[in-house]
A protein has these predicted regions:
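S-adenosyl-L-methionine
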Residues: 1-61, 74-103, 107
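A short, conserved alpha-helix within the catalytic core of class I
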Residues: 114-127
């Protein structure tokens, strides 16, 4: 599967680009035909992204509001009404999925500040219905030419955990790709889009379960 970046979405903006994020989500959701949406918003913050996507159009040529049937925001700090306050970890994803609970959602947003791939892995192996997954991958440099490489990235790339690997950009990008496209017997990425900016990547992915693991 090849991630296909859309030239129309490659906007030169900063890491906080609401326009990029909302355009990317609209494009995938409309193409996948997932409405009405049942949204699980991880790292929800003040709910700015989904507040914008649900807002009725005020201008003539503005896009229509997305049809959101339910919205569940979760973050470690309470910043909006109705939010669940909890630290976002793979253990939380497992708890949410007890009794097949993740099947209640057909849209999962992981708009974190750093590495989303531990959460991505926890989600991928539990998806039982066609689901839009949105990932924000931020990059922070620690020292000259170094960035942190997670234990999961090393594992997926086949690098021993104890090795002190130079955090070069090329290796980080390869590690991200390996984690994103890791083999999964229960679900696969049907198609996706990616926006690459200087310090952040935005991914929009439609994930479908295999026939044997789909929830009817």
């Amino acid at each position: 599967m090849t991630l296909l970046p859309s030239p129309k979405l490659k906007l030169k903006t900063d890491n906080q680009s609401l326009g990029d994020k909302t355009a990317l989500r609209r494009k995938l959701i409309k193409q996948a035909g997932l409405e009405p949406l049942r949204v699980l918003d991880l790292f929800a913050g003040e709910g700015t992204i989904w507040g914008s996507l649900r807002q009725p159009a005020r201008l003539k040529n503005a896009p229509e509001a997305l049809n959101v049937e339910s919205y569940t925001p979760i973050d470690s700090v309470a910043r909006q009404p109705g939010q669940i306050r909890f630290k976002i970890t793979p253990r939380l994803i497992a708890a949410l999925d007890e009794g097949g609970g993740l099947s209640r959602y057909n849209c999962v947003d992981v708009d974190c500040f750093g590495d989303p791939f531990a959460i991505w892995q926890a989600l991928l192996f539990r998806i039982r219905v066609p689901t839009a997954v949105f990932l924000t991958r931020g990059r922070v440099t620690y020292g000259a030419g170094r960035m942190p490489i997670s234990k999961l990235a090393k594992k997926v790339m086949g690098i021993p955990e104890e090795w002190d690997v130079p955090g070069k950009v090329e290796l980080m990008e390869y590690g991200d790709r390996c984690q994103l496209l890791q083999p999964c017997p229960t679900a696969k990425i049907a198609f996706g889009y990616k926006i690459t900016l200087r310090r952040v990547d935005y991914y929009a992915l439609l994930v479908k379960p295999t026939e044997a693991h789909a929830t009817t």
